[in-house]
Amino acid sequence: MNGLRVWIILSWIALPTVMYGGYSLLQLINRGNVLTPFQVTWFRAGHAHAGVLLLLSLLYYTFLDKTSFSPIVKHGACATLVAGILAQSGGFFLHMMMGQPDQASVGTTITVIGAILLVVAIAALIYGLVTAP
């Protein structure tokens, strides 16, 4: 687990930022008329995905450590996972700021790229677990 320590620490550091995002959303909603209903929807989606995926990352590192992957492959898998988390949740925030109702935007594209990165990272983990001695 020592080899993955930096990734674990980064996830734990990122978690309070997601918590602060929830506080920020609540403050904006309570002020009223700051965000449109469209913006609130996409802010919530980005916030929820960031929180859930960050918690998933902590499990991911635990299981990745049980594989027989080399340290380089483990770090590559972690980097792919983190990039996927940032793109998946960040795309929702970008869509909130730049998108329009019922239309795709650059945020939508980034969210899809994030989902693909997450699938790649999870597929690597599954492969590593299946082939572990």
Regions found by a protein language model. Name each.
Residues 1-133:
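Polytopic transmembrane helical bundles with strong interfacial aromatic enrichment
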